[in-house]
């Protein structure tokens, strides 16, 4: 059963323990104990670069055409009212009200107190809003998200809109153990040769996601 907004708020009080765990996991005698929490089977993320130079031409925002198929093909979509990371950290640099977009069957089971179901057009508008706010989109399949919301882990996927100051994944990359890097990949936009020759920076028909970074 999915968790109520009040329960999620209570669980978020434990948020500071996450940073402590990142640091403890770097200690040799604790790394073996905490390593299961950093396995790809429990947590996977792909960070999609924003505003990077493509094909030697102008700098463009690529994520939208890469993320749109995920949104369009999902069986259900749910927009969370507030970013868990920015809410827990008290972010002052970016809007906390731009929350994660959950996709898949489990998204339909999120407690409506946490946000709202979304149509394809509403979900795509939310993605665009996150990009315009300067947030970095990250495709995440994290057991923590499923646990805190009380939804099935294997039936969900999330598109998070991350800031460098509060994102728990980015904090883990900076402060966590080497094993944390195994759970995160850097997406890369790759264009077909004919588009490069034509000087086209980016467009949906020629843009594909290369998860190998």
Residue ranges of predicted features:
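Short Cys/His-rich "knuckle" micro-motifs
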Residues: 170-172
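Conserved hydrophobic/aromatic pocket- or pore-lining residues that grip, position, or stack substrates
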Residues: 162
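Short functional micro-motifs and their immediate structural scaffolds
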Residues: 167
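Iron-sulfur (Fe-S) cluster-binding modules
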Residues: 1-142, 147-159, 175-213
